[in-house]
């Protein structure tokens, strides 16, 4: 492998697995390694990643730690929420939507430093390998991709730990007795997968959850909040305007405190197998309820129903790694156009695991009380309904007459 690659940009968390990958790249390719660590709001201190990269011989100018929280929410999470995207009807795509931003920034760094390759720590069984690499190739078609989990012989946790000890890679004390699941986190969600959770019959441990209280332990008094929208995006909570990242952070706090946002599902991976995942998405779970309520007031029936028809396809594209695909961009263009009228305020009640809409208002509301009232009105002639019904029933009447 020596000489195949001159410089590689590694998506680096600073954890054990990507530190092993870093050393493996140095050994196998004898190339210059550039580390990239993204702050997506995972709630971890990232400076230790810089220290560990230095310890492993990475030059200071080759260490990138970027705060991408605002870009993540503004340019990836919010556009996705304009579509009300749910994969297989329930999953808010917290992991899926983070991957294209990481890929994008990796390629930007590769262009900056003149790297001819990129590398990631996703395994050969999961969706993330697809998501990362789809992004790489979409943005830089001639880039070389190194996926160590598909190449090396470190096929067990024991072999990984032995490799780390042999190469003097620091091993955290808890790594020999690891948590009985793996996690992935960002500002939108945290996921728990694998190990003890692989059996879909096993109930998740209560002490596993970090972003929400159990619904039954949530406060006995509901929390009322108001979310203001402009052109499909949330911009304020209770009248206080916030940046995209700050707003999602606040919704996470409010939703989590009221036991909202837990999800346990078995999903269909793009690579063909099913997997069981447990997720906490408190802020996102509140936001999607509020957004749909705002749309119900401001979108025409045809617009709304067309969006609902396209949503499963849109969500599947994101889940499968096609964020940069032309069809995803085309659907997004339609969604963004429709969202220009989605402005106003939604009032919600957060109570013991449920976010309920209790009020909505908009300067662009299509709801007309003078038309819908059960009292006497002067704008709607109920006699018009007779011809409307007859015309819509005509094809069924003809079918019955012809077929009996």
Swiss-Prot record:
Main location, first listed in the record: cytoplasm
Xref: Pfam families: Arginosuc_syn_C, Arginosuc_synth
Protein known as: Argininosuccinate synthase
Class of enzymatic activity (EC top level): ligase
UniProt: ATP binding residues: 11-19, 38, 121
Organism whose genome encodes this protein: Paramagnetospirillum magneticum (strain ATCC 700264 / AMB-1) (Magnetospirillum magneticum)
Enzyme Commission designation: 6.3.4.5
Domain of life: Bacteria
Gene: argG
Keyword Membrane (UniProt): no
């Amino acid at each position: 492998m020596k000489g195949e690659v001159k410089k590689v940009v590694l998506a680096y968390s600073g954890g054990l697995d990507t530190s092993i990958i870093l050393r493996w790249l140095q050994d196998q390719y004898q190339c210059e390694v550039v580390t990239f660590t993204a702050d997506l709001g995972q709630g971890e201190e990232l400076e230790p990643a810089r220290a560990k990269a230095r310890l492993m011989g990475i030059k200071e100018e080759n260490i990138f730690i970027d705060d991408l929280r605002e870009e993540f929410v503004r340019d990836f999470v919010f556009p996705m929420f304009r579509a009300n995207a749910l994969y297989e009807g329930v999953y808010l795509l917290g992991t899926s939507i983070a991957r294209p931003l990481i890929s994008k920034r990796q390629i930007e760094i590769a262009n900056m430093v003149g790297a001819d390759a990129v590398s990631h720590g996703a395994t050969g069984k999961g969706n993330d390998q697809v998501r990362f690499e789809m992004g790489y190739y979409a943005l830089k078609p001639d880039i070389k991709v190194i996926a160590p989990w598909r190449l090396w012989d470190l096929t067990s946790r024991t072999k990984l730990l032995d490799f780390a000890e042999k190469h003097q890679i620091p091993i955290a004390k808890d790594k020999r007795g690891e948590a009985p699941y793996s996690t992935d986190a960002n500002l939108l969600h945290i996921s728990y997968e694998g190990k003890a959770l692989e059996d879909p019959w096993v109930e998740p441990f209560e002490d596993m959850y970090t972003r929400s209280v159990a619904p039954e332990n949530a406060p006995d008094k509901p929390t009322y909040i108001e979310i203001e929208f402009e052109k499909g995006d949330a911009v304020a909570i209770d009248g206080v305007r916030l940046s995209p990242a700050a707003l999602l952070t606040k919704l996470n706090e409010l939703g989590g405190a009221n036991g909202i946002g837990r999800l346990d599902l078995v999903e269909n991976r793009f690579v063909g197998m099913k997997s069981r995942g447990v997720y906490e998405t408190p802020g996102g779970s509140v936001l999607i309820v509020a957004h749909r309520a705002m749309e119900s007031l401001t979108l025409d029936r045809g617009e709304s129903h067309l969006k609902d028809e396209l949503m499963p396809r849109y969500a599947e594209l994101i889940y499968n790694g096609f964020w940069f695909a032309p069809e995803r961009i085309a659907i997004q263009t339609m969604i963004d156009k429709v969202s220009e009228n989605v402005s106003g305020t939604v009032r919600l009640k957060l109570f013991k695991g449920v976010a309920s809409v209790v009020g909505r208002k908009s300067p662009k509301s299509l709801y007309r009380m003078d038309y819908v009232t059960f009292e006497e009105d002067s704008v709607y002639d109920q006699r018009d309904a007779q011809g409307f019904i007859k015309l819509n029933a005509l094809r069924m009447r003809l079918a019955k007459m012809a077929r009996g």
